[in-house]
Curated annotation (Swiss-Prot):
<keyword id="KW-0934">Plastid</keyword>
<comment type="similarity">
    <text>Belongs to the PsbP family.</text>
</comment>
<feature type="transit peptide" description="Chloroplast">
    <location>
        <begin position="1"/>
        <end position="74"/>
    </location>
</feature>
<dbReference type="GO" id="GO:0009654">
    <property type="term" value="C:photosystem II oxygen evolving complex"/>
</dbReference>
<keyword id="KW-0150">Chloroplast</keyword>
<keyword id="KW-0602">Photosynthesis</keyword>
<keyword id="KW-0472">Membrane</keyword>
<dbReference type="GO" id="GO:0009535">
    <property type="term" value="C:chloroplast thylakoid membrane"/>
</dbReference>
<dbReference type="InterPro" id="IPR002683">
    <property type="entry name" value="PsbP_C"/>
</dbReference>
<comment type="function">
    <text>May be involved in the regulation of photosystem II.</text>
</comment>
<keyword id="KW-0809">Transit peptide</keyword>
<dbReference type="GO" id="GO:0015979">
    <property type="term" value="P:photosynthesis"/>
</dbReference>
<keyword id="KW-0793">Thylakoid</keyword>
<dbReference type="Pfam" id="PF01789">
    <property type="entry name" value="PsbP"/>
</dbReference>
<keyword id="KW-0604">Photosystem II</keyword>
<dbReference type="InterPro" id="IPR016123">
    <property type="entry name" value="Mog1/PsbP_a/b/a-sand"/>
</dbReference>
<dbReference type="GO" id="GO:0005509">
    <property type="term" value="F:calcium ion binding"/>
</dbReference>
Amino acid sequence: MAASTQCFLHQYHALRSSPARTSSVPSPKPNQLICRAQKQDDANNTSNAVSRRLALTLLIGTAAIGSKVSPADAAYGEAANVFGKPKENTDFLPYNGDGFKLQIPAKWNPSKEIEFPGQVLRYEDNFDSTSNLMVAVTPTDKKSITDYGSPEEFLSKVDYLLGKQAYFGKTDSEGGFESGAVATANLLEASSATVGGKQYYYLSVLTRTADGDEGGKHQLITATVNDGKLYICKAQAGDKRWFKGAKKFVENAATSFSIA
């Protein structure tokens, strides 16, 4: 008897911690050192010359401590900005679509593959198509994304975004899958925010399939409603590549999405 694929959503409360920030304390204003040459007899000339040189050295050293850090100075592991000009982020390129905008990884290429209803944009990694992003725009009668319910309830209404399993039938798969299930979806984080007067939902999901590779997929979803349209941006990467640097590109792409 055929059995359809099911995704089981398990909610995990992600703990957030704000990174510690250190504030720089301005160095005290260097004390002015005054050297006065006094007439001494010939026996003290050498001693006075040494004293003047020592005072001058202290004055220069104190002034150096009190001066501002040059833009050319670099933190450990960073290249020095010799000319003091602001560095440009060349890892991402701005993209302005019809009613939306986002940052796309510079080394990802446009793709013509259509996966979801209303899809208007798709980019993928040059070396691994599992790492990709897409934007879909569909009509809706909702006035706000909150009209879909909570972020978790919204995800249940658009669970097609998490992908479909090709196998249909009874099976007992290894890897922690329930009997008869060949796919799981774990909701790692769900949040909302107001940007430019619009409410946004942010979802982080880890999906796994019994026949999949990469150890699963990290899928980040950003969604909002504007002028009778539901805007969804989904960026993803395989679990292995996620921890090898893809996380940076997927997170930036998903969180940079907004209504233009």
